[in-house]
A protein has these predicted regions:
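Active-site neighborhoods and metal-handling regions in enzymes and metal-associated proteins
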Residues: 1-599
């Protein structure tokens, strides 16, 4: 079935490309800060392709178009691109060219690649330069072709900014600036251009609301050895925030003056830039007169290691969040089949339980509630117009989280609503085993997620199955639900940043199995990396679990587990009951006792 709306938009875009002398036009999923999740204003790729996932790049040329996305979105993209004329390129699959390889093979000498350099990361822009230089291809990077076509484009975001109290942040702005400058000095830089939104919020102890579910404000910062300049929309600042920034000696300038400011800098500064988040436009602006050190934002690692105040508040918040999710599971299991419940109304009920928590601020991402085969799409999102009705059979996968004044949560449970097949039981059991094996990791300091990923993936690989995504990611503190530099994946990919686990880093533990057209299973906890014994061999480490939500006993078949896996699972379920039951009523408590096997 043709999607004429998208086809017509692409026709208008191609006409604009011809007018501007552009042969290939690229649209990533990004804002001016290369954020993972973006405000509606920046959803240009979605506007021209119909693909709604959080990761993907659209490339359009005279007689075709292609979308590159990762394994989380293959099923979703296939459905959403149907009839648009946009071809799906499945990243990291055998025989599928990368976007750079595709350009190298298809763009001709003398042709032009165009994009809006403000939404292309410098790292990517430099790759395209290198690939295309061989064929004398021109890059036109000051072209936002969407603006004249997207006539009802949403307004540029400018939500209210708030101050995060130091008692909640755990460190003052001065302490954070001192730590940042120390790391700048180690990199031999006398200035830092900071463009990553969550790093900016962390550094200045402020929060915004410019991206749905991500408490960030559109901003940049230029940090020197003795000054800090924040570029932010001043209409987003009230008197309290302005006075707070002034009291901490932070010079505030209008957001859209950053390019002129950088152009006005005296030549010869040694400026640290992180090319993953610095836009190609800003990079090219600085490159003309400044010496650039291309490295990682020092703030990223500082932010990832949660301080004692953050850790303490996270433990409190994760417990409250776990209670809310447990109550939701009880409600779901006792009401399904007795009243109409859809994927959407189930998600709404869970949100309602979270809103009852006094510290609740917002969801940390739109809830994913996928019933039966819908759960095979890792980032499926139901709508009131298009959602499944739940029946007392099969399984519902619910991936959800909250933003609280005290932490950001992310938890997934796959819930049996009635009878399931033997294959589903086996798959569920092995996913639970995978979670438990990683939970009990014990390692020497120096390991990254790539070293530990096999602990979760092995039980699933043993069935000749894989999940096309990472096993874990960091989680922000009243910030983005996806945070680096720590992550957990089994293989190295281009541009991937690896980080050694440090005491106080958090990481999700979320293996899964996704069978297209049948079912999807994921179980997800968040864990803290902590120091353990230190001896002549070095510093040993382990994980402490933050998430305490029951694993569905109805779908566990212990014949697939070894004695150690059974022991780990029983210990987790017992701890869930001990921690959660004091907050439940008698009926809920009795159900939880049976659900966890303590009764």
């Amino acid at each position: 079935m043709e999607n004429k709306v998208i086809q017509d938009r692409l026709t208008l875009l191609r006409a604009k490309m011809q007018e501007e002398g552009i042969d290939f036009y690229m649209m990533p999923t990004a804002d001016f800060h290369n954020s993972e999740y973006v405000n509606d204003y920046f959803k240009v790729r979605e506007y021209f392709s119909n693909f709604t996932g959080s990761n993907g790049t659209l490339l359009v040329w005279k007689d075709g178009a292609g979308l590159w996305t990762d394994g989380r979105y293959f099923i979703q993209a296939e459905a959403e691109l149907e009839g648009t004329g946009v071809e799906l390129f499945r990243m990291l699959q055998e025989g599928v060219p990368t976007i750079e390889e595709f350009l190298e093979q298809n763009i001709q000498q003398g042709q032009t690649l165009g994009f809006d350099g403000r939404v292309i990361a410098a790292m990517d822009g430099k790759k395209y330069e290198k690939v295309l230089a061989k064929a004398q291809i021109c890059i036109a990077y000051e072209k936002d072709l969407a603006d004249s076509i997207w006539t009802d484009r949403p307004d540029f975001p400018a939500g209210k900014v708030t101050v995060l109290d130091e008692k909640i942040a755990g460190k003052s702005v001065e302490e954070k600036l001192t730590q940042t400058r120390e790391k700048m000095a180690k990199d031999c830089a006398n200035a830092l251009l900071l463009t990553k939104l969550d790093d900016l919020m962390w550094l200045f102890n402020i929060r915004g609301c410019d991206v749905e579910c991500n408490p960030v404000a559109m901003s940049y910062a230029y940090i020197t050895e003795d000054t800090a300049t924040l570029f932010i929309q001043q209409k987003a600042l009230d008197t309290q925030v302005s006075e707070y920034l002034a009291a901490h000696h932070i010079d505030v300038k209008e957001y859209d003056t950053v390019v002129d400011f950088l152009k006005s800098l005296p030549a010869g500064n040694v400026i640290l830039v992180d090319n993953r988040y610095c836009s190609y436009t800003l990079y090219k602006t600085l490159q003309k007169n400044q010496r650039l050190i291309e490295g990682k934002n020092p703030t990223e690692l500082l932010k990832a290691i949660k301080n004692p105040v953050e850790q303490s508040r996270m433990q409190e918040i994760f417990l409250k969040d776990s209670v809310a999710v447990t109550k939701f599971i009880y409600w779901l299991k006792t009401h399904v089949g007795k009243e109409k419940i859809t994927e959407v109304t189930a998600a709404d009920y869970l949100e309602q339980k979270r809103r009852e928590i006094p510290e609740f601020l917002d969801l940390s991402f739109p809830t994913i509630a996928g019933y039966k085969s819908n759960a095979a799409m890792m980032h499926y999102e139901a709508t009131p117009e298009n959602c499944a009705t739940l029946e007392p059979e099969g399984m519902l996968l619910v991936d959800s989280g909250g933003q609280y004044l005290g932490g950001t949560t992310d938890v997934t449970r796959t819930i049996a609503l009635g009878p399931v097949s033997d294959e589903m039981k086996k798959h569920y059991t092995m996913v639970a085993a995978a979670v438990m094996q990683l939970t009990h990791a014990h390692w020497l300091y120096g390991c990254t997620g790539r070293n530990l990923d096999i602990l979760a993936r092995q039980p699933i690989w043993d069935m000749d199955i894989d999940y096309q995504c990472g096993t874990g990611h960091g989680v922000g503190y009243i910030l983005n639900v996806h945070e680096g530099p720590q992550n957990m994946r089994w293989r190295f990919t281009g541009g991937m940043v690896e980080a050694v686990f440090e005491d106080g880093m958090d990481i999700t533990n979320e293996p899964g199995i996704y069978i297209q057209g049948s079912h999807g299973i994921r179980i997800e906890n968040v864990m803290l990396a902590k120091n353990d014994v230190k001896n002549e061999y070095g510093q040993f480490m382990h994980f402490e679990t933050l998430t305490w939500v029951p694993i569905d006993r109805e779908v566990i078949d212990e014949k697939y587990l070894n004695d150690t896996q059974i022991k780990y699972l029983h210990e987790y379920q017992k701890t869930v009951y001990e921690k959660i039951s004091p907050y439940l009523n008698e009926e809920e408590k009795e159900w939880l006792a049976a659900e966890t096997g303590v009764k």
